[in-house]
Amino acid sequence: MLAVERQLQTKVSYQFIPLVNMKTIQHTLDLYHLSRCHLKQRQCVSCMLYQVALDIKAASFQGGQHGRQYLVNVQKIMSDRTVEYTDEIVKRIAQLANLDWATFTEDRHSQMVRKSLRKDQTIADDLGVIDTPTAIVLDTCDPDYSLLIHDFTYQKLIDCARHGQLHINQDHRLVHK
């Protein structure tokens, strides 16, 4: 994100929302070459993705940077498709993200984290996000305006600003044109 801020010469605020829906579940089943028709496998994948999302949210309760670090480490470690998302792996990822283990353990099972994740999922659903990676750029000056960027990359955000879909005002904030 720092590269985007440098390129656009503006401050960009962002929040990562882990998305758990039928499409992400099916994508994971396909990625691991699991049957879409095998109910038990589908349920296991669904539970695992939900727990990963809860853990990312719990990590973010210790600060946004910790949440992002947890997300990045989950992606790195789980890219090895032979690794299972076990308590041992969770502890390793939490250590890499410099989380307070006792707080994280308590938060990842808390009702507050569940409610916060549910709220994030509702926001994503309300804004039409069904696939990852997707970004929603919100104009802080005009809350009715947002730009949905499918197959999000930082370069696409920069391109949107350069091609007139976004404008940087005198306060160095992204706004719609």
Task: Please describe what each predicted stretch is.
Residues L2-T82:
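Structural alpha/beta surface segment adjacent to cysteine/selenocysteine redox centers
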Residues M1-Q9, Y85-K177:
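C-terminal cap of thioredoxin/glutaredoxin-like
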